[in-house]
């Protein structure tokens, strides 16, 4: 029989060997209680969802108004013609590491945007959606 402390030590060692980087699958809803309010405000407002070329675009508005499954998202009615999955989007969530989840009415994440570099990238790329960005002023 293997002592519990050996099993715990092996589990810890394996966890350390597997890397400490947080993957997109590990993201959790962000605890915004300690976040600078101005940083949070910068997340709210108009955004553009686009394909990789930027030729296909869809306008959304992310709000701070709570709803079932996250916060209210206003999706331009024309979006579902450009990106059919947008017809199912009912909420958005701010995730750790400033990720953005778009969720359906059953609270299932349909698209997750993360920032591996300096721009948001969709995971998975659905209906050609590649990124979400704030419109240039």
Where are the model-predicted features located?
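Contiguous, well-ordered beta-strand patches that form the walls/edges
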Residues: 74-115
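Structural signal for glycine-centered tight turns and loop->strand junctions in beta-sheet-rich domains
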Residues: 66-68, 98
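Sec/Tat signal peptide C-region and signal peptidase I cleavage site
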Residues: 20-24
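Bacterial N-terminal signal peptides
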Residues: 9-18
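Bacterial N-terminal signal peptides that target proteins for export
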Residues: 1-10
